[in-house]
Amino acid sequence: MPTSESRKVFLTGASSGIGLEIAKLLGGHGFDVWGTSRDPARLQQVPHVHPVSLDLAQSDSIRVNFAAALREAGAFDVLINNAGHGAFGALGSMPADVLREQFQVLVEGPAELMRLALPSMRDRGRGTIINVTSLAAQFPIPFMAPYSAAKSALSVLTQALRIELGVPSIRIVEVRPGDIHTPFHEQTRKVDGNARGADHERMKSVWETQMRNMAAAPSPACVAQAVLRAVNSRNPPPVLVVGGVFQARVAPLASRLSSVRLQEYVLRRYYQL
C-alpha cells in the first residue's frame, strides 16, 4: 500500500514502451504509480505500480476507472498522459472511424483525464500534469496524418491549459519525444493494406524509413528521465523535446529559421518520397 509520504502518479499506457520505462523509473524513486493498461495483468510484477484497467477509447472506462483509482490513492500529485498508438495509411482513403479513434485515444481521452484530475489538484493547491506528445506534432509523418494531427492537438491543448489555468503551483508540461526505440510500430494499425503501384511504393518507403529510424533511436529511458526531471522540478520548462541530438535540438531550431515550403521539401527527402 502507498505511504502517506510517497507522491502518487496516474500514468496511462504503463505496460510497454515509454510508459513502462516511466513506471519503473518513478517507482524506483519512491513514487507510487497507478498505471493503466488494457491488459493490467502485464503490470502485476512491476514494483510500486498499481495496475488499472482502462481503455482510452471508451469514455465510461476513463471515468469509472479513474474514479476508482482516485478513491484508492486519496489524491494524485501527478497525471501523465502517455498512452497511444498510431494508424498508418493514406489519408485520402482512410476510414472515418480510424480518424475518430485516433482523436479519442490521443486527444479526447487525455482531455477527460485532465478534467477529472484538476479539481483535486486545485483543492490541494498543487500538482503536475505531463502530456507526452510527439515530434510528429511539429513535423508530421507521411501516411500517419491522424496520429500527427492528434499529437499536434494535444500539444496545443497543453499550452492552452497552461495559459488559462493561472495556478503556478499546478505545472503543465509537454514532453515531446522524437524517434524512440520501442515496440510502437508493432501496435500501429496499418490501413490501406491493398494499396498498389506508386501509392504502395511511397507507403513502403515511409514505413521502412520509420523502422530504420526506430531501430537506431535512443531507448525510452531518455524520455523517462525527462519526465522524472519535470516531476521533481519546481519550475519545469513548458516543453521538453527528447530524443537524438538531430531530432531533439537541430531540427526544432532549423524549423524556426526556415519556410514551410523548405520544411516540407526536407521531410520528403527524409522519407525518400
Q: What are these model-predicted stretches?
A:
Residues M114-R115, Q159:
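A short, exposed helix-loop element centered on a Lys and neighboring polar residues
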Residues E164-M214:
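C-terminal beta-strand-loop-alpha-helix "lid" module of Rossmann-like NAD(P)-dependent dehydrogenases
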Residues P47-D60:
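Rossmann-fold cofactor-recognition segment
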Residues S15-S16:
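Conserved glycine-rich cofactor-binding loop
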Residues A90-L91, V98-F103:
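Substrate-binding pocket helix/loop in short-chain dehydrogenase/reductase
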Residues M114, A150-A153:
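Active-site helix of classical SDR
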Residues S134:
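Residue(s) in the substrate-gating loop at a strand-loop-helix junction
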